[in-house]
């Protein structure tokens, strides 16, 4: 079973941070940046979305937390008059948006988003919508296994710089340098 979780990247589901902290106290909770950006852009007019999104990118592409925070303040100041509420959640949630800055650039690129697991969840939801009743638990497990197996056939692109990512994560896991338990989860 899982012995430790280095990073949990999730959307803003209430209670997830506290639940994970209770079971795995050393886990870094990271709010999904892609979800944060999407939620922010809901407050922005269509004509300004591209420019606003580029400004947001400057925050999460910053080299360190201090620079990211300064860029967040700069983006807030720039757009405050036109979109006074757009950046409010960034400021309120900075503590769960900034943990990524503790990791290397390679690791950050992996943890920005939960899209990979969301894609798998989509496959599993489709299975559920096609067939809402299963004759037994075993039938359900077999269907889930086959759907997952089929989904993995599409996973042809390796993660960029995966060697460096695992190396960085191993260095973060001080108590067990020989095995890595790196989970990026969405709930």
Predicted segments — roles?
Residues 4, 28, 108-111:
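A generic hydrophobic-helix recognition signal that picks specific residues
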Residues 1, 12-15, 118:
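Glycine-centered flexibility sites
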């Amino acid at each position: 079973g899982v012995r430790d979780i280095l990073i949990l990247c999730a959307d803003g589901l209430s209670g997830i941070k506290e639940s994970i902290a209770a079971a795995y106290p050393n886990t870094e909770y990271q709010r999904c940046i892609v979800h944060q950006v999407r939620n922010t852009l809901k407050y922005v007019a269509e004509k300004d979305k591209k420019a606003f999104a580029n400004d947001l990118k400057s925050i999460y592409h910053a080299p360190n937390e201090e620079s990211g925070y300064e860029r967040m303040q700069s983006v807030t100041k720039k757009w405050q008059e036109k979109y006074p509420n757009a950046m409010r959640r960034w400021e309120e949630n900075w503590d769960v948006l900034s943990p990524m800055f503790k990791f290397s650039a390679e690791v950050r690129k992996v943890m920005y988003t939960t899209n990979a697991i969301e894609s798998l969840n989509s496959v599993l939801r489709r299975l559920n919508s096609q067939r809402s009743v299963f004759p037994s638990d075993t039938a359900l497990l077999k269907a889930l296994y086959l759907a997952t197996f089929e989904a993995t056939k599409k996973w042809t692109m390796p993660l960029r710089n995966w060697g460096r990512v695992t190396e960085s994560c191993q260095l973060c896991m001080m108590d067990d340098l020989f095995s890595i338990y790196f989970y990026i989860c969405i709930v």
